[in-house]
Amino acid sequence: EDYRRSLYLHEYETKLISQRMPRNVEDTLVQTFYNTHRQQLILTETIIQGLLLVVPNQAPKLDELKKKIQQPELEENIEWIEKFAYQYATGYELFTDEWKTTSDIIVLMPLEQDNLDKQLKNKRQIEIQDSINTYLLQVTDLHMKGDEKPITYARKEIEEILLRQRQVEFIQQERNKLYNKAIETGKLKLYENE
């Protein structure tokens, strides 16, 4: 019977949260949380921004491509790279405005994660060639394993933490409201021991 009541209560609280609790988290709250807790927000894996191309070894203009990917921030280079990728590449990922983990990257190129991490410490452009393809990785930004997470990467995690905190507070407030209303309407009476 207690188990059933707790299931009903949980279902009621879940519906209350979905219907009445605000889901948006203000930027200022995220920034404040980040500033206060950034030492606890540590990367468990290296993350990068940049671009990756997988190109057949016989593709034309490979040397020109290698020069263009060194400056992916230039709009004309990105346009040229995208046209090239559309025509010749077997794989193309542009992630200059989003973070990818090194484990996301090694799925796309023949390289061990530890080896990639070691290479990333020393260089921003990595080129690997096998019998069929050339793999070109250009890194525009990176944070190594053990570094503090950048706020752009930690944002979703922080929002989830803040929403969980808000949920706990919201449920407590709703319980208090129900408790006070029950006392006011006489549905709940308090007796004091003498």
Identify what each model region corresponds to.
Residues 1-194:
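Peptidyl-prolyl cis-trans isomerase
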